[in-house]
């Protein structure tokens, strides 16, 4: 019997690397997808390639998008500064419709691969407040996926799996370490340099550092 397949969104960060390890532990044959979408730096794409190689995924695909042509986010528009202090409401690092776009392309690849499970590393506990990281979004996208695809209407339902949804960052770190994830390969910083070193000041850096500290595990992050 063929091993079950899964498509996994892999950003190169801590969360998505953990999800790959979780899927592999569940017996999935893993296909990872990253996006060159006009983000501020290429460090996370380099990290995604390292993680995919280190974890031995079946195939790692990088899709080119031009979300910086739309702008509207500090991650895609160089005229908007990345904040270095917590903010109220949805932060300027939110990229309009990003997870909707990413999941749509992952859905297309999953249908081609005859995979029925798509994993995403969104989290609604220790997170930045993005609307497309909430459980309601994941559930709604799954319903849409099964209405919008040939496989879905033929009864071969897709599942959108978000195993980190209700975990704290410390719990995520502990789970990943238990599964052998090498977090030194990952990059979480919104404004990392070309060598993958982190600023230590942005929201993503803060959440990552707090997660390792709360987990009681040494943080392998390099800073500039």
Curated annotation (Swiss-Prot):
Its cofactor is Zn(2+). Disulfide bonds: none annotated. Its EC number is 6.3.4.20. GO terms for biological process: queuosine biosynthetic process. It is an enzyme of class 6 (ligase). ATP binds at residues 10-20. Zn(2+) binds at residues 189, 199, 202, 205. The keyword Nucleotide-binding applies. Gene3D superfamilies: HUPs. SUPFAM superfamilies: Adenine nucleotide alpha hydrolases-like. Binds 1 zinc ion per subunit. It catalyses: 7-carboxy-7-deazaguanine + NH4(+) + ATP = 7-cyano-7-deazaguanine + ADP + phosphate + H2O + H(+). Pathway: Purine metabolism; 7-cyano-7-deazaguanine biosynthesis. Transmembrane segments: none annotated. Keywords: ATP-binding, Ligase, Metal-binding, Nucleotide-binding, Queuosine biosynthesis, Zinc. GO terms for molecular function: ATP binding; ligase activity, forming carbon-nitrogen bonds; zinc ion binding. It holds the Pfam family QueC. Catalyzes the ATP-dependent conversion of 7-carboxy-7-deazaguanine (CDG) to 7-cyano-7-deazaguanine (preQ(0)). Belongs to the QueC family. This is 7-cyano-7-deazaguanine synthase. It comes from Pseudomonas fluorescens (strain SBW25).
